[in-house]
């Protein structure tokens, strides 16, 4: 079988566990998408764009993880290759949107929003594209090379989100400044997991 993920080796119990988690993910993403679109009217106008983006992210993820599950079933039955690209196609769309959502929810001045969007969206796309060749390679040297290249825009994104946002704290209302401080720490904690998981076999 092509690729580095041979799902035909899964036991019946392992297959059921993966299927169950994917099913739970479908339900969660569908419910979240519906809720977010219906909740727009109850959100302040300046935050509605962030809500729409959030709903779009979960809708895109719902579609791609359904495709992952469909490929997973076909590959497990034998005769077809498990399509490893669906996750990266999903991330290529959703990660830039998540960054746009982060910028939108902070309610920064228009000039700041445009500047951050222009820098972060291309960097996030480069990070995903550069990471894919290493993800699908079983060779650790190849994985390390592409992982290193992907880390350049990854670190740039963290730099912009942490350092550049820090520069705006003094000019922001106290409630916005507090949100930015918490967000910086959350981003470091959550995004820091990705390089570790990328290098795992």
Residue ranges and their predicted role:
Residues 12-17, 78-92:
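Short aromatic-rich membrane-water interface segments that cap or initiate transmembrane helices
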Residues 28, 50-70, 192-199:
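Hydrophobic alpha-helical transmembrane segments of multi-pass membrane proteins
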Residues 33-36, 88-121, 125-136:
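Internal transmembrane alpha-helix with an interfacial aromatic "cap," most often the third helix
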């Amino acid at each position: 079988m092509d690729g580095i993920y041979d799902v035909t080796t899964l036991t019946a119990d392992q297959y059921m566990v993966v299927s169950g988690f994917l099913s739970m993910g479908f339900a969660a993403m569908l419910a979240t998408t519906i809720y977010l679109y219906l909740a727009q009217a109850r959100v302040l106008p300046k935050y509605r764009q962030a809500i729409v983006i959030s709903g779009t992210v979960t809708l895109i993820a719902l579609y791609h993880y359904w495709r992952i599950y469909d490929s997973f079933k076909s590959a497990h039955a034998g005769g077809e290759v498990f399509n490893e690209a669906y996750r990266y196609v999903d991330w290529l769309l959703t990660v830039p949107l998540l960054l746009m959502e982060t910028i939108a929810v902070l309610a920064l001045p228009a000039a700041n929003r445009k500047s951050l969007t222009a820098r972060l969206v291309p960097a996030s796309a480069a990070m995903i594209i550069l990471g894919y060749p290493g993800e699908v390679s079983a060779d650790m040297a190849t994985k390390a090379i592409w992982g290193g290249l992907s880390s350049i825009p990854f670190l740039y994104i963290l730099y912009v989100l942490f350092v550049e946002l820090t520069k705006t704290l003094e000019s922001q209302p106290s409630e916005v400044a507090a949100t930015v401080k918490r967000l910086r720490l959350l981003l470091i904690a959550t995004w820091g997991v990705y390089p570790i998981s990328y290098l795992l076999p």
